C-alpha cells in the first residue's frame, strides 16, 4: 500500500474466487431473545430444483489512495455460469480494467494466488497482449501480476470479507433460490448485480478470450 500511496494513478487489487453455498450454514454468533436461540436449519435440495447447490463468484478488493490522503476501498463481484476457469478469469479482468480507467487509474497491482485459472498460459498471454496494447495506445490500465506464496490464502485480505459476507447472507430456516442468494451477496458487498460471467456477450477485439482454458 505504501507503493500505491506514492503513485496516485495506481490501484492495489486483491483477487480471489469463492463458492456461495445454498446448503452449508456458516458458524456465527447472533443476538436473540431469552430462551429463543437462533437455530440454523440444515437444508436439502429438492429433486426438481433447477438451481446449482453452490454459486461461484469472482471478486476484486480494490484499494487506492484518495486525493485527501485517505485509503479508499471497494469490492467488485461477478458470479459465474459454472466454475472458475481461465476464460472467466480473462472476462473478469477485462471487465475490471475499464472500471479502473474510469476512476483515473493507469496500473493495477494484481495480488492473487497460484490457482490454475490464474497462472495458465491463456491468462498470462492475455495479460501480456493487454499490456502491450495499453503501452501502444497510451490508454487503459496496465496489469502487474503479484503472486502470493503457494498455499497461503490467508495473506489475501479479501478472504475475511468472504467469511463475513457468508454470515451476513445466511437464511436460518429456508433454502435460498440462486437469484436471491446472488442478490443478498451483492447487497452485503454494496455492489450492483451484473450478468453472469460465461454468458455469450460481445467483446472488444483485443479482449477476445483464447480458446485454451485451465
Q: Residue spans of the language-model regions?
A:
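A short acidic (Asp/Glu
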Residues: 23-26, 120-124, 158
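Extended, low-complexity cationic-aromatic segments
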Residues: 1-95
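Short, basic/hydrophobic alpha-helical segments
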Residues: 88-109
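C-terminal anion-handling pockets and recognition modules
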Residues: 9-10, 142, 151, 155-214
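RNase H-like polynucleotidyl transferase catalytic core
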Residues: 36-48, 130-160, 173-175
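Acidic/histidine-rich, metal-coordinating catalytic segments
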Residues: 16, 105-119, 148, 156
Amino acid at each position: 500500500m505504501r507503493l500505491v500511496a506514492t503513485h496516485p494513478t495506481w490501484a492495489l487489487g486483491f483477487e480471489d474466487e469463492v463458492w456461495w453455498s445454498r446448503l452449508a450454514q456458516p458458524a456465527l454468533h447472533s443476538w436473540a431473545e431469552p430462551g429463543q436461540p437462533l437455530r440454523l436449519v440444515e437444508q436439502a435440495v429438492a429433486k426438481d430444483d433447477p438451481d446449482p447447490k453452490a454459486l461461484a463468484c469472482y471478486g476484486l478488493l480494490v484499494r487506492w489512495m484518495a486525493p485527501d490522503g485517505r485509503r479508499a476501498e471497494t469490492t467488485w463481484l461477478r458470479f459465474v455460469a459454472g466454475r472458475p476457469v481461465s476464460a472467466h478469469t480473462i472476462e473478469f479482468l477485462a471487465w475490471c480494467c475499464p472500471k479502473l480507467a474510469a476512476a483515473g487509474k493507469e496500473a493495477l497491482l494484481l495480488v492473487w494466488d497460484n490457482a490454475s485459472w490464474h497462472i495458465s498460459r491463456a491468462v498470462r498471454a492475455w495479460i501480456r497482449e493487454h499490456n502491450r496494447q495499453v503501452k501502444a495506445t497510451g490508454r487503459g490500465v496496465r496489469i502487474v501480476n503479484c503472486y502470493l506464496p503457494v498455499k497461503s490464502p490467508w495473506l489475501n485480505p479479501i478472504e475475511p470479507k468472504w467469511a463475513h459476507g457468508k454470515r451476513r447472507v445466511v437464511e436460518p430456516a429456508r433454502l435460498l433460490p440462486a437469484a436471491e442468494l446472488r442478490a443478498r451477496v451483492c447487497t452485503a458487498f454494496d455492489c450492483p448485480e451484473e450478468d453472469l460471467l460465461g454468458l455469450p456477450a460481445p467483446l472488444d477485439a483485443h479482449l477476445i478470450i483464447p480458446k485454451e482454458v485451465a
